[in-house]
């Protein structure tokens, strides 16, 4: 007997009933769990009028105290923005729930207009990002130091000579050191000690890029439809900015890669990330696609490390000038270990006080005060708070670094906070390294490389130089202003100081350091 119409309809009705029940349960959960606290929202625009235009990390930290919560939420034209003001909250969500919190928000300015969409560190979570990360990790693996440590030693020695010859250009030399080391490791290219075109290109690019990557810097990121407005219409300055950035992106991605390819073809090259990757491409089934991917990853390495590492090293110099008693203690430790020779990577564990100084550098002035934004790919509930799917999530590294529960008197520069009374590392104190380089699956892939360069440079400089406050025409010391260029990446502005060899023996070591050197080759 054929089933009746009612019998045929029953399975369909059951499916729809199940779907309806699922939606009802989901809606009840959302009603039960409210959003994290934050300023009162206006209809449609939300908190657009409340969002700080600059130094937003301090505002968000203050709001957290006002609402007695280490997680707060605001909205901008329908977009949920969640700020995590404690390391515990960041680890709970970005690390332990990384399956939900590992994507990146889409930026119309960055991903569509500026030409910088190739930067895999800012890509959404997915295969393209994983491929970029794998390529980087394969070459810059911290367990294979023999590849890159000799280059760090080479360029740090040149850095010492640069400081000796032109002591008034500290931050220029810092950028040259980091940029040169990165270029050598990535492309096998050598740079000039002064006014190198590749280093200058990175400097121009990162200044412009840091602006477009700053949250809320351009209205087109809040109202994406504005991208269709012609460039000649008043109020569309983002088009001019994007055009400038496209030029930078092209040269950063293409120019050093082209030179590296030409060197490799002649056989006169130093092994590098690019040379190793090009050799791997010989067996590729999709060589053209993989070649473009390689350019993307190399360009990312070239620009990313050059700015963040230089910022931290610049802060180290500023701190040593501002806090001479810290400098002297570090020098005493170095003298007891080195006995007049230059430091090497194997010496790092013998420098507990210097290691504490570098930890305090990371904490005192975070390089990325708001971190790099994450984005949720699903609804979540945390401490009875509903965090909507698609929320942009910031780890407020500045708030974490100034958390009095972890770091009493956070305004003080005090390396001793990381040491026990007998001068050994105090593992009970949260290591700022675990904050400074991000969280979860999106943690900075180059963190160990950056830390190695910073530590070697800091140890080498303090073993040979005194970093002193500048003096005016009356011989009175000039206190550095401690001002920073504030954007997504915070970097110290130029500050007056004096740099001089500690003694005659130190000067002899410095004078022997080369400004140029014979390039090792693949042969």
Swiss-Prot record:
Pathway: Secondary metabolite biosynthesis; terpenoid biosynthesis. It is a single-pass membrane protein. It is found in: Membrane. The chain crosses the membrane at residues 9-29. Heme binds at residue 444. GO terms for molecular function: heme binding; iron ion binding; monooxygenase activity; oxidoreductase activity, acting on paired donors, with incorporation or reduction of molecular oxygen. Keywords: Glycoprotein, Heme, Iron, Membrane, Metal-binding, Monooxygenase, Oxidoreductase, Transmembrane, Transmembrane helix. One of its GO terms (biological process) is terpenoid biosynthetic process. It is an enzyme of class 1 (oxidoreductase). Pfam families: p450 (PF00067). Its EC number is 1.-.-.-. CDD domains: CYP64-like. GO terms for cellular component: membrane. Its main location: membrane. Belongs to the cytochrome P450 family. This is Cytochrome P450 monooxygenase ple1. It comes from Rhodocybe pseudopiperita (Clitopilus pseudopiperitus). The gene is ple1.
